[in-house]
């Protein structure tokens, strides 16, 4: 009876101490799976929706500086760097260029005939403006790094859809809109090969941990851009809604997993490729994490993402998008990431010898840390551009630690030598024959006995 009780107790302990069925580990990179450097969509697309146009909230006053600029002390930071000489690639919905957002064509992965300089969603244009929008005497807006060189790569668009029926609406590789994990991987490689020193990806694909997606090419592309070409990659943490269900917080009773990898229920990509990428969450004007900002053990920093101001197609200030019931304020981790990409460009200009990992280290080490030093909503904290550009801190490791798929060395196979091989075959046949004769003899002896 005592043995049975011990066995029951052991089973109960195993049940309560075992990680959840969906527990995951950080992704593993297959460095040899880099996709080809090719533009164009995965399959032919067509436009099925009219283009969106950003708008303005009632009673807006653009003469004053946006709250995010003051919160981040952007004007003070620009005394130390403005992004001059740094190239930032914006992988997004494209950019409609203007004198205040003078982007250059970087490639189109939505329309085979495009070059990246057409934006039917406004998202890419507004993202690019927050990164590197130029100032104007008529309003108070200026981007984080107004002297950067902007490259526009159109990789997604809700206005375009692949021709024909979709195979799997739950797979980010077969989404209802133009753009996929595969085309994102190709766009990362293309941006890196164009010489981008900072790559902004204000996109997020969410899926449940119980339904794994093949991201081999994306992981390889990110590793290639960072560790081979030397680009800093900044990505959005993602917004809750649709496929993006909020992740639970870490379990304090499991100190061996302080960031809560075992609690993750929703994977966000490319956000979960931290620390190769810097994943950015959103805060509001009160400095608190935004309700819509996806959390996860991969979040590295945070920046303003609510009630923002940017520039529209014509280079004029906008702060809303059209909604069913009127204008909707400009919110989202997409724009939080844009602020951090701009800061990465400033750091790159001021400290040109730093590696991507060291630039990320400088941004996170000088951030306004939350209680406890780090959490899954704001990571190391809200960025502090002035501190990132002025504090004296250790550079940190040249490369970020990351799990890479180990490929065994090729096995040496000597050239064929017919003589020895023939001898071995003959000897083997002779041995087999001898063994066979011996077996027959033993059977005969047993029968006689």
UniProtKB/Swiss-Prot annotation:
GO biological process: protein processing
Enzyme Commission number(s) of this protein: 3.4.21.-
Bilayer-spanning residue ranges: 421-441
Topology in membrane: Single-pass membrane protein
Coiled-coil segments: none
Subcellular localization(s) per the UniProt record: Cell membrane
GO cellular component, one term: plasma membrane
Function: May play a dual role in regulation of ESX-1 secretion and virulence. Acts as a protease that cleaves EspB.
Family listed: Belongs to the peptidase S8 family.
Protein name: Mycosin-1
Organism: Mycolicibacterium smegmatis (strain ATCC 700084 / mc(2)155)
Gene name linked to the record: mycP1
């Amino acid at each position: 009876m005592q043995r049975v009780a011990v066995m029951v107790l052991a089973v109960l302990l195993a049940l309560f101490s075992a990680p959840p069925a969906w527990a995951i580990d950080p992704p593993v990179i297959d460095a040899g799976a880099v996709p080809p450097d090719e533009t164009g969509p995965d399959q032919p697309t067509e436009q099925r929706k009219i283009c969106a146009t950003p708008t303005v909230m009632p009673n807006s006053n653009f003469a004053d500086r946006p709250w995010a600029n003051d919160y981040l002390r952007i004007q003070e930071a620009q005394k130390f760097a403005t992004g001059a000489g740094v190239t930032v690639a914006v992988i997004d919905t494209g950019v409609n260029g203007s004198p205040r957002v003078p982007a250059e064509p970087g490639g189109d992965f939505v329309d085979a005939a495009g070059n990246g300089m057409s934006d039917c969603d406004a998202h890419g244009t507004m993202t690019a403006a927050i990164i590197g929008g130029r100032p104007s005497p008529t309003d108070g807006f200026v981007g984080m790094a107004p002297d950067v060189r902007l490259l526009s790569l159109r990789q997604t668009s809700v206005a375009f859809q692949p021709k024909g029926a979709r195979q799997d609406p739950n797979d980010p590789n077969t989404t209802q809109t133009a753009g996929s994990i595969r085309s994102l991987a190709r766009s990362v490689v293309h941006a890196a090969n164009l010489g981008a020193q900072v790559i902004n990806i204000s996109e997020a694909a969410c899926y449940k941990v119980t339904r794994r997606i093949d991201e081999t090419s994306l992981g390889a592309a990110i590793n290639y851009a960072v560790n081979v070409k030397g680009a800093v990659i900044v990505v959005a943490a993602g917004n809750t809604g649709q496929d993006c269900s909020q992740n639970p917080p870490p379990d304090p009773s499991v100190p061996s997993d302080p960031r809560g990898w075992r609690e993750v229920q929703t994977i966000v990509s490319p956000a979960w490729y931290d620390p190769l990428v810097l994943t950015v969450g959103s805060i509001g004007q009160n400095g608190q994490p935004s309700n819509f900002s996806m959390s996860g053990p991969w979040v590295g920093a945070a920046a303003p993402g609510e009630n923002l101001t940017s520039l529209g197609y014509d280079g004029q200030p906008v702060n809303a998008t059209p909604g069913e019931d009127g204008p909707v304020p400009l919110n989202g981790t997409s724009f939080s990431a844009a602020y951090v990409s701009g800061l990465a460009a400033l750091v790159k200009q001021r400290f040109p010898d730093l590696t991507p990992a060291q630039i990320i280290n400088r941004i996170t080490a000088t951030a306004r840390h939350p209680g406890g030093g780090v959490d899954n909503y704001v990571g190391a904290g809200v960025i502090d551009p002035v501190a990132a550009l002025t504090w004296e801190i250790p550079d940190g490791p040249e490369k970020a630690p990351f799990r890479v798929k180990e490929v065994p060395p090729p096995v040496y196979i000597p050239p064929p030598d017919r003589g020895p091989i023939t001898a071995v075959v003959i000897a083997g046949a002779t041995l087999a024959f001898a063994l066979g004769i011996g077996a027959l003899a033993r059977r005969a002896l047993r029968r006689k006995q």
